[in-house]
């Protein structure tokens, strides 16, 4: 019989760091919630809590609006580290 995989419990990085407010100008905090194509990653992949996920989404949308991070990247321009040029 096949062995069951033991998954490690995901935890919220923002709760562990005791972050009360996520600022849209702090791109270092936002990079954990973005994929390599600058898409917002869901909670089930990042492990963030519902409260912090909502704050992250709002901060990312504000950062996109003021052009701190791009809305989307072409497939040809995908880089391994999206925050290298920022």
UniProtKB/Swiss-Prot annotation:
Listed InterPro entries: Ribosomal_bS18, Ribosomal_bS18_sf
GO biological process: translation
Protein name stated in the entry: Small ribosomal subunit protein bS18
PANTHER family assigned: 30S RIBOSOMAL PROTEIN S18, SMALL RIBOSOMAL SUBUNIT PROTEIN BS18M
GO MF entries: small ribosomal subunit rRNA binding; structural constituent of ribosome
GO cellular component, one term: cytosolic small ribosomal subunit
Source organism (scientific name): Campylobacter lari (strain RM2100 / D67 / ATCC BAA-1060)
Xref: HAMAP family: Ribosomal_bS18
Family: Belongs to the bacterial ribosomal protein bS18 family.
Oligomeric form and interacting partners: Part of the 30S ribosomal subunit. Forms a tight heterodimer with protein bS6.
Function, as annotated: Binds as a heterodimer with protein bS6 to the central domain of the 16S rRNA, where it helps stabilize the platform of the 30S subunit.
Keywords carried by this UniProt record: Ribonucleoprotein, Ribosomal protein, RNA-binding, rRNA-binding
């Amino acid at each position: 019989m096949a062995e069951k995989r033991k998954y490690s419990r995901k935890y919220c990085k923002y709760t562990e760091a005791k972050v009360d407010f996520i600022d849209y100008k702090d791109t270092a905090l936002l990079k954990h919630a973005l994929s390599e194509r600058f898409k917002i990653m869901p909670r089930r992949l990042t492990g963030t809590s519902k409260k912090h996920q909502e704050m992250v989404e709002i901060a990312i949308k504000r950062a996109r609006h003021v052009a701190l991070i791009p809305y989307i990247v072409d497939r040809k321009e995908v880089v391994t580290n999206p925050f290298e040029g920022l």
